[in-house]
Design a protein with these regions (language model features):
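Hydrophobic cores of alpha-helical transmembrane segments in multi-pass inner/ER membrane proteins
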Residues: 2, 78-89, 142-150, 204-220
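N-terminal signal-anchor transmembrane alpha helix
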Residues: 17-47
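C-terminal ends of transmembrane alpha-helices
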Residues: 35-45, 117-129, 175-192
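Internal transmembrane alpha-helix with an interfacial aromatic "cap," most often the third helix
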Residues: 40, 77-106, 148-158, 222
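Interfacial helix-start motif at the membrane-water boundary
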Residues: 61-84
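Transmembrane alpha-helix entry/boundary detector in multi-pass membrane proteins
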Residues: 70-76, 103-108, 127-141
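Membrane-proximal helix-loop-helix units in multi-pass membrane proteins
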Residues: 115-156
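Terminal transmembrane helical module of multi-pass membrane proteins
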Residues: 152-225
Length: 225
């Protein structure tokens, strides 16, 4: 009986799998968010920020502008829904990969959940709450190191090696797109009326969220085998 007890203590605990359905939250969140800014970008006629009325253009202006004016309830709701669904999905995905060690699992969960937390923060604090809103966007950009670290962790698993390699490559790609966005972004009321910051930010957002969708799809496909 004592030997059996000792043997059980030596066996590492296998994390509880939350199921591929919850894992799809990592895809559902980005899809909802993308549809929101696509549709609302054509609907919005403008908003008032810091007492100044600003006509909206998806070419010139960032997605955050949709969190003000008539589109605010829908866009901010999408920001928050994206955060909640993505975090739930990420937790389910990495708890569903039993080959990962405890530290590696929670490192990946933390790294890939921070951008989702940033999305939720940006839904709670709009563009007029500049500092917390900017902090939320900064959390989104933690995907630059987060993709690389997660990729190296997944590369150690034979069945995830290819995806891990692609995720490592996503890190410098995200950095390039972030630099492109900041190079075209003018954080003034006048600056929102010209330029292509709306396009470059949307390219950055779409690229980041596409990797979350790919991660959820890859995990779900393997889980259903």
């Amino acid at each position: 009986m004592i030997e059996l007890q000792q043997e059980r203590e030596r066996v590492p605990a296998v994390p509880r799998r939350l199921g591929p359905g919850i894992a799809l939250g990592a895809a559902a969140g980005p899809v909802v968010f993308t549809l929101a800014w696509l549709v609302l970008g054509f609907i919005s006629r403008g908003y008032t920020a810091w007492g100044v009325y600003v006509p909206y253009s998806p070419i010139h202006q960032t997605v955050s502008g949709l969190g003000l004016g008539a589109t605010a309830p829908f866009m901010n709701g999408a920001f928050i829904a994206n955060g909640i669904l993505t975090v739930a999905g990420i937790i389910a995905i990495f708890n569903g990969i039993p080959a990962l060690g405890h530290r590696a699992r929670w490192t990946c969960i933390a790294l890939l959940s921070m951008p989702a937390l940033g999305s939720a923060i940006d839904g709670i604090f709009t563009l007029e709450s500049f500092l917390p809103h900017t902090a939320g966007f900064a959390l989104v950009l933690t995907t630059i190191p987060g993709f690389a670290v997660t990729g190296f962790v997944l590369r150690r698993l034979p069945e995830w090696k290819r995806f891990g390699t692609w995720l490592i490559a996503a890190s410098p790609l995200t950095l390039v797109l972030a630099v492109l966005f900041f190079a075209t972004f003018n954080p003034t009321i006048a600056g929102t009326q010209s330029g292509i910051a709306g396009i470059t930010e949307r390219l950055l957002i779409f690229e980041i969220q596409a990797w979350y969708v790919a991660l959820a799809w890859t995990f779900t496909r393997r889980a259903n085998r």
